[in-house]
UniProtKB/Swiss-Prot annotation:
Residues 504-518 have a biased composition (Low complexity). This is ARF GTPase-activating protein GIT2. The modification Phosphoserine is found at S393, S396, S508, S511, S519, S563. Residues 376-592 are annotated as: Disordered. Pfam families: Ank_2, ArfGap, GIT1_C, GIT_SHD. Residues 519-532 have a biased composition (Basic and acidic residues). Keywords: ANK repeat, GTPase activation, Metal-binding, Phosphoprotein, Repeat, Zinc, Zinc-finger.
Amino acid sequence: MSKRLRSSDVCADCNGPDPSWASVNRGTFICDECCSVHRSLGRHISQVRHLKHTAWPPTLLQMVETLYNNGANSIWEHSLLDPASIMSGRRKANPQDKVHPNKAEFIRAKYQMLAFVHRLPCREDDSVTAKDLSKQLHSSVRTGNLETCLRLLSLGAQANFFHPEKGSTPLHVASKAGQILQAELLAVYGADPGTQDSSGKTPVDYARQGGHHELAERLIEIQYELTDRLAFYLCGRKPDHKSGQHFLIPQRADSLDLSELAKAAKKKLQSLSNHLFEELAMDVYDEVDRRETDAVWLATQNHSTLVTETTVVPFLPVNPEYSSTRNQGRQKLARFNAHEFATLVIDILSDAKRRQQGSPLSRSKDNVELILRTVSTQHSTESQDNDQPDYDSVASDEDTDVETRASKANRQKLQTLQSENSSLRRQATASACQVQTGSDHKDTASHSSLKRRPSARGSRPMSMYETGSGQKPYLPMGEASHPEESRTRLQPFPTHIGRSALVTSSSSLPSFPSTLSWSRDESARRASRLEKQNSTPESDYDNTACDPEPDDTGSTRKGRQRSMLWQGDGLLPDTAEPHSVPSPTLPSTEDVIRKTEQITKNIQELLRAAQENKHDSYIPCSERIHVAVTEMAALFPKKPKSDTVRTSLRLLTSSAYRLQSECRKALPGDSSLPTDVQLVTQQVIQCAYDIAKAAKQLVTITTKENSS
């Protein structure tokens, strides 16, 4: 490896001199121009920080410096180091290249599609590979070799992996060994400082026992990173965790009484389920980061040279792991003015503290308010068109650039769905083979689930910094912890797409505190209810008790989420019909696989039509998909016993219905308003993605149940 690649004096992406930004989760330093592209990709791809004008925890900066100086960039450019790559015409961007399209395309290929990372040979059971990698990570973190651990994480090792024999996670091992930089890296990829091992001890406990007090204090800071960041955004101060102060809630500058509208909005915020409240808080965190990074960006740029090529980030970039509804809600946060956004942040801090402490709702006059006039206005103006996907046009002078990014986002979603569809086909085939051979992993799965006891923070939210897998505890193939989580990330990926769904998880996740007074029985009881929570609606973070479609985030949350076991969560109602008699009967695996193959075949036809811009083919394709979905749903009882089956069936059927509705919009209508075909295509792909995911869940469930 050349010294040039190891030097922190050059940009990791174009070799330009004097990089002033860092990509924390990638362990690289980047220049201003390349940073503009990183920002446009979103924090789920790259977490950027300015090296001088951003407040850094010292050990976090030291971790990034150590990684880059030891060649972490070669992980993301592995195949480019091969002399054969020169013959193939692939090359790295140069400082003289234009940002668009040269640098932008290279950076997207490098980090978003992972086109140059080392790929392990595909195996029949890729979950075994992930488990082996996670065990290697478990052993490696006791040493100081950061690059080895980042390489393992990039290959699919799980930062929250619970070692079945050792009874601990990698963060327990790193904390016991006093490896503070390893702990920083694991936290970036989703490791949970609040997870308990088989002895009931957390990484903080081991750090204190070993006399590693700096590490113990840092782990506590990581636990409260989300609320600390929000408080710092408002008042420039953080709570003093050493003295036991874990929340700092700034006071309002004025003494105005809450309006009736503000009181109603605040009450609605307080009535959100913990799951939806977590998602809203994480989205607000992302918006805080966007605004702070914008301020640093504008203060540090030489506008005379960069104004023509700088990528504008007027709102949060689309995260393909999230549903279109949630992405819309996230982008609407950019419409809040400074006062409105500050009061929203204050109320989130107040309610986070209340939920953690288990305090009842106060009827006294509060000193904070939630001003959502913007959203209220939007609701009144959008009520006539609620079915239209609304990616808000936040003010931007670079419409062409935004359209280009949207087009590329569509292509990325197409590739992701193709990967998912291919994965679904492989799973159906593998399941068929499993049924024929009668393979049985019941004992292994049950043992793993027993060892991986519910903890206060079983997995991290995937919002802020990650794309998906790293924040979740390791789950063996076919073992689904949440309906949203069942998009198995431990399967081989086709050669035409990067392993982004597997290895781009980069979670330095700001998270809620995990030191909550929940008993083990309560934790276990909540774990059994998580599937029901996942079916709560997320439209503008509403909390109505209807039969909503589940969030398609696919990751923990990121079930994907690091659980914030709030006080009183045990009172959440079951969404199932109270007087229905559930049926335990599930269809045969062979029947489910046969119908799944019909669905995947029809989805593939729709994808081809989307790629070739054959919009007139959308409707017939969607009708065939709807027929196949209806036939598959008819195989299952009307009132399944399993919550997971009910949720998956809801997602399957509702997505097929939405797909038909979206496909109709692709045809030119009589309306004088032009059809945004690009946006329609994005929604069509999203619906097809949801259908494929739901079908995969049902294949997994029936295979597991029928083989047990």
